[in-house]
Amino acid sequence: YCQKWLWTCDSERKCCEDMVCRLWCKKRL
């Protein structure tokens, strides 16, 4: 489960495996 404050698309620490996380990351990018 991805925490909101852990959502990131960094190559080193990725937390975008969940669909919601992906959408959030895409929105940020």
Curated annotation (Swiss-Prot):
Q: Where in the cell is it found?
A: Secreted
Q: Which cysteines are joined by disulfide bonds?
A: 2-16, 9-21, 15-25
Q: Name one GO molecular function term.
A: toxin activity
- Protein family membership: Belongs to the neurotoxin 30 (phrixotoxin) family.
Q: Superkingdom of this entry's organism?
A: Eukaryota
> Any other noteworthy remark?
Negative results: does not inhibit sodium channels Nav1.5/SCN5A, and potassium channels Kv1.1/KCNA1, Kv1.4/KCNA4, Kv11.2/KCNH6, Kv11.3/KCNH7 (IC(50)>200 uM).
Query: In which tissues has expression of this protein been reported?
Result: Expressed by the venom gland.
**Record remark: domains:** The presence of a 'disulfide through disulfide knot' structurally defines this protein as a knottin.
Q: What are the GO cellular component annotations? A: extracellular region
Q: Which residues carry this modification: Leucine amide?
A: 29
Q: What the protein does?
A: Inhibits the voltage-gated sodium channels Nav1.1/SCN1A (IC(50)=360 nM), Nav1.2/SCN2A (IC(50)=600 nM), Nav1.3/SCN3A (IC(50)=1280), Nav1.4/SCN4A (IC(50)=330 nM), Nav1.6/SCN8A (IC(50)=1200 nM), Nav1.7/SCN9A (IC(50)=1-40 nM), and voltage-gated potassium channels Kv11.1/KCNH2 (IC(50)=4.8 uM). Induces analgesia in mammals. This analgesia is mediated by a non-opioid receptor related mechanism.
User: Which protein is depicted?
Assistant: Beta-theraphotoxin-Gr1b
Q: Which UniProt keywords apply?
A: Amidation, Disulfide bond, Ion channel impairing toxin, Knottin, Neurotoxin, Potassium channel impairing toxin, Secreted, Toxin, Voltage-gated potassium channel impairing toxin, Voltage-gated sodium channel impairing toxin
Positions in coiled-coil regions: none
